[in-house]
Amino acid sequence: MSDFKRRKLEGGKSAIDAARERKALKKASAPLKKSHAKPAPSNKPTAKRPPPPSPPQSQSEEDEDEFGGFSGEEEEDVSRAKMTNGSTAKADAEAEQSDEEAEAQAAAAVEAPKKTFADLGVREELCDACENLGYKTATPIQTESIPLALAGKDIIGLAETGSGKTAAFVLPILQALLDKPQAYFGLIMAPTRELAYQISQQVDALGSIINVKCATLVGGMDMVPQAIALSKRPHIIVASPGRLLDHLENTKGFSLKHLKYLVLDEADRLLDLDFGDSLDKIFKVLPRDDRHTYLFSATMSSKVESLQRAALKNPVRVSISSSSHQVVSTLLQSYMLIPHKYKDLYLIHLLNDNIGHATILFTRTVNETQRLAVLLRTLGFQALPLHGQLSQSNRLGALNKFKAKARDILVATDVAARGLDIPSVDLVVNFDLPHDSETYVHRVGRTARAGKSGKAVSFVTQYDLEIFQRIEHALGKQVPEEKVSRDEVMVYAERVGEAQRVAVREMKDLHDQRKSGRGGRGGGRGGGRGGRGRGGRRDNMDMDEG
């Protein structure tokens, strides 16, 4: 291994140890609390891996040291360092967790038995619809918010991702609609097209027994079919703010002056995406009196507080998640410490250990999303890309194929990290770490939803150490490391190398097509915000898409 590369990897090693030492020294003077924390469960994958391809015929010892990141002596040094710091780090971790465990045990002791939807006051027809969808008992956010909604209260709902909040606001609207059927009865606003379509599907499913009509209004789609759907006077409208405003201003005969229910879903995200001006204009044409409003959000920022004051009347706050960085207890988190240049090899090893499991891979850029999708398809994996520069039809097609299990790997930017209810995701892989801990929580929240178990694995390279330390700090605990033998990973080097060359050629063709204005497989006609990069502008394929 070259001195430069060795220094880089050694720097990575010392950075982790130094961070842990600083943390241990900082807390050494404070008395430690007693703890009965149980050891973390093993993160070793249990799925059997098919026979790997034959290893390369020739492999130098220098290449092996370079690949693995540490020589044998270095590995012993790392082990000794971890053992030296291990007792202190373990004690610190136990001290940190003791209060949390005590609170969790206290909460469990007083937790009431799970309630059915009938217990919450939901009518029999809608209970039957819930039963048909496999909803046996209500989730905590449903248990807390549905009775309040049925009592006519405005609600602010703060809940962790995957908590079942969509049904929490759809069921009360449908129940009120049964008592007083009316066109344009309810309006649900969502920040993204995908989330809007997902909510519409939930409305259709829960309202199928009572023949509810729902229209979906989102950008990137032809306005004419949407106007036709509005002319049929649907009971419920699910919309993104921008496209809803377009129809309010341009579609003849469409008015919401008799609206009874308004829902702002993912309100923090609505404001993050600069929908504030559109929302102000929409609120001006909505009735203020005789309207019930529900606001659901992952966080309660100052912007959301302002939105609450503008849209709600004497709301009741329902908070299920005590922290914006809380993850569900059924989620098993781990990380792999790997050299940056071998991320593809580690990924293939991980996916082979999870053959047949529904998996979402998260990347930072559109370019990397496309490259990984090509790489995986070349190696025989059923992978689809999902990012903001795909046309709307391609994005919906990718989501529907993944939901229907026609494809088992979705390679996505953070366009898919919030709000999407994709059932039965077994594994989330942070191929690229997100820039902040909140995005991390939303990403890993795609699995272990509604009480199911799931796993999230993060790739941490020598360039990601500081970011990962910040994520761990926000989570309030250390994420356990998942170790992989370099020999197990190295057997994929030859085949992965060939697939990488294929991906490079395809990506070059794609970029050439974009420069010539012909679009291409990655872009579609809908493109993304910011266009095609004409006039020497940076290609949007290389930009972060958070």
UniProtKB/Swiss-Prot annotation:
Keyword Transmembrane among UniProt keywords: no
Source superkingdom: Eukaryota
Keyword Magnesium set for record: no
Domain Helicase ATP-binding: 146-318
Catalytic activity: ATP + H2O = ADP + phosphate + H(+)
PROSITE patterns in alphabetical order: DEAD_ATP_HELICASE, HELICASE_ATP_BIND_1, HELICASE_CTER, Q_MOTIF
One Gene Ontology term, aspect cellular component: nucleus
Binding site for ATP: 159-166
Molecular functions (GO terms): ATP binding; ATP hydrolysis activity; RNA binding; RNA helicase activity
Stretches for region Disordered: 1-108, 504-546
Biased composition (Gly residues): 519-530
Motif (Q motif): 115-143
Biased segments, Acidic residues type: 60-77, 94-103
GO biological process: rRNA processing
Entry's localization field: Nucleus
Domain called Helicase C-terminal: residue spans: 342-490
UniProt short sequence motif DEAD box, positions renumbered to this chain: 265-268
EC number: 3.6.4.13
Residue stretches of biased makeup (Basic and acidic residues): 504-515, 536-546
Recorded domain comment: The Q motif is unique to and characteristic of the DEAD box family of RNA helicases and controls ATP binding and hydrolysis.
UniProt function note: ATP-dependent rRNA helicase required for pre-ribosomal RNA processing. Involved in the maturation of the 35S-pre-rRNA and to its cleavage to mature 18S rRNA.
Family of the protein in this entry: Belongs to the DEAD box helicase family. DDX47/RRP3 subfamily.
Quaternary data: Interacts with the SSU processome.
Protein name (Swiss-Prot/TrEMBL): ATP-dependent rRNA helicase RRP3
Gene source species: Phaeosphaeria nodorum (strain SN15 / ATCC MYA-4574 / FGSC 10173)
